[in-house]
A protein has these predicted regions:
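Soluble metallo-hydrolase cores and metallopeptidase-like ectodomains found primarily
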Residues: 1-24, 99-209, 222-225, 229-235, ...
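Metal-dependent peptidase/peptidase-like ectodomains
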Residues: 1, 23, 102-129, 232, ...
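C-terminal recognition in membrane/secretory proteostasis and scaffolding
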Residues: 346, 373-485
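Second-shell loop/turn segments in exported
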Residues: 7, 17-22, 45-63, 100-107, ...
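Protease-associated
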Residues: 1-64, 155-157, 170, 394-396, ...
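Terminal peptide-recognition signature
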Residues: 6, 27, 66, 110, ...
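His/Asp/Glu-rich mid-to-C-terminal helical/loop segments that flank catalytic regions of hydrolases
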Residues: 218-221, 225, 229, 341-389
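Acidic/histidine-rich catalytic neighborhood of metal-dependent amide-processing enzymes
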Residues: 50-55, 61, 82, 176, ...
Length: 485
């Protein structure tokens, strides 16, 4: 590829904010140079939702915008002036769009090189950034037409077929057999950890995924076997399905929900098991109970003898396959035994699975399925109010390292910690599992989204004051944030 260059500011067209880097700029057939992130990101009063990055900051969004404006490639440059002290690192761009192809070439170039390219114009990327950030004015322009960039990117995308594995147990009641209870779990994991590994130094080693999610997959197989051998067959039909592609986003469950083998509205409910093999202290997490009246009571009744300490959440959304059915307005229940330090690491191995408690979880799910099967009418879907969510900056992660693991149980205000990683900034400050974070850097924290955005506004080395509730006691500590690894 050989094409002329244009500078396109942050590469954002956002009519809702009355902002357009491409206004008056002809990018057709050209390579666009864009800054990372978005304008005024350190300004609480920015029209771009203050310090909370919007979806426009995502590299995938910038690439889509560049393509829509006719560009043939996009060069990304770090906006170092907004992030003093951050390393000028080149990003790994292979995961910015998940499994989707962007249909445009994206590379990153260091600011020092862009400085040389812009020198004839009398500008640098940082002084242009400052001018844009000052008043959101447009400073896009075409470079000298004689200046071309030739680039060769050698990418081989290998496509291999993968499949959901689906089984059907027909119901015996003629009036109910055309209604379906779905019991599912994802069977994929991370392979060698090239994407999403939380052990970057061990990328290339087998990430076993015993808990995530051989445990849930085993649960589906056990339930299929059990229900097919029960003396009394279910009245409703039961679909048992093991999904592929969950670790890339709930892609294959979404495909199933979009191309169901039966009318999707004939679904009674969808039950998802993801990581059910590491029950600790008899604690189990069940979410989705707000997606239909009576679901929480149904689970409580099913738990009467097993007596798990269940933490309920009403939300039907989450980072697993049940979300694909929530968006179709299907009642869902998600069973989860909690995060642990082996999550997304090679150390998630079978010797750490608690098979006894895992079997108890499967028994609980069996009881729930029987409870659903006993219903005379399909449960009514209820849309649960979700907190507002904004996008994250592509490649930006969640900012500096803090070290808490969230407890996904609902609390009235704040973020409850299910654990605190040993040696982390949070642990060094004396924070503990069970603490509820209510303030971070003197800013109120109502939910995990608040915490994510506030944390991302900081950088490694910052000293921040945090306040937690420990029982009824308010405790304030100073935490020194570190580099996320």
């Amino acid at each position: 590829m050989n094409a002329p260059l244009v500078f396109a500011g942050y590469g954002i067209t956002a009519p809702e904010y009355h902002y357009d880097d491409y206004k008056g700029l002809d990018a057709t057939g050209r390579i666009v140079i864009v800054l990372r992130h978005e304008p005024q990101e350190n300004d609480d009063k920015s029209v771009f939702e203050g310090r909370q990055l919007t979806p426009h900051a995502e590299l995938a969004s910038k690439a889509t915008s560049a393509k829509n404006h006719g560009a043939v490639a996009m060069i990304v440059v770090n906006d170092l002036g907004n992030h003093p002290g951050d390393p000028d690192e080149l990003l790994r761009l292979n995961g910015i769009s998940g499994s989707q192809e962007m249909s445009i070439t994206i590379i990153q170039v260091k600011p020092a090189i862009i400085d040389e390219w812009l020198k004839p114009s009398g500008h640098t990327p940082d002084d242009l950034r400052q001018q844009i950030d000052k008043d959101l004015s447009n400073h896009s322009f075409a470079l000298d037409p004689a200046a071309h960039v030739a680039m060769t990117v050698d990418i081989e995308r290998i496509h291999r077929p993968v499949a959901n594995v689906v089984g059907l147990l027909p119901g015996i009641d003629p009036a109910l057999a055309d209604q379906y209870i779905i019991v599912g779990a994802h069977y994929d994991h991370l392979g060698l950890g090239q994407q999403h590994s939380l052990a970057p130094r061990e990328v290339g080693q087998v990430h076993h995924g015993a808990d995530d999610n051989a445990s849930g997959t085993s649960g589906v197989l056990e339930l299929a076997d059990a229900f097919s051998h029960f003396p009394r067959r279910p009245r409703h039909s039961i679909i048992f399905v093991c999904f592929a592609g969950e670790e890339l986003g709930p892609l294959w469950s979404a495909y199933f929900a979009n191309h169901p083998p039966f009318p999707i509205k004939q679904t009674v409910a969808m039950i998802n098991m993801d990581m059910i093999g590491r029950v600790s202290k008899n604690k189990l997490y069940v979410s989705g109970t707000g997606t239909s009246p009576g679901l929480q009571k149904l689970v409580q009744d099913a738990n009467h003898v097993l007596n798990f300490d269940i933490s309920f959440s009403s939300s039907g959304y989450g980072a697993s396959d049940h979300t694909s059915f929530t968006v179709k307005e299907i009642p869902v229940l998600f069973f989860f035994s909690g995060l642990h330090s082996d999550y997304h690491k090679p150390s998630d191995t079978s010797d750490k699975i608690d098979a006894v408690d895992g079997a108890r979880v499967v028994e609980l799910v069996a009881n729930v399925v029987q409870g659903l099967d006993a219903l005379k009418e399909k449960p009514q879907y209820v849309k649960v109010a979700e907190p507002a969510h904004s996008g994250t900056g592509g490649g930006g992660g969640y900012g500096p390292y803090f070290g808490s693991i969230p407890d996904f149980a609902e609390v009235e205000h704040g973020v409850k910690f299910s654990d605190v990683r040993d040696g982390s900034p949070a642990a060094k400050a004396g924070l503990k599992a069970g603490d509820i974070l209510i303030e971070f850097d003197e800013k109120k924290v109502d939910n995990l989204y608040d915490f994510t955005y506030i944390l991302r506004a900081h950088k490694p080395g910052d000293k921040v004051t945090v306040t937690v509730l420990r029982g009824t006691e308010k405790i304030t500590r100073e935490v020194t944030l570190e580099v996320r690894k």
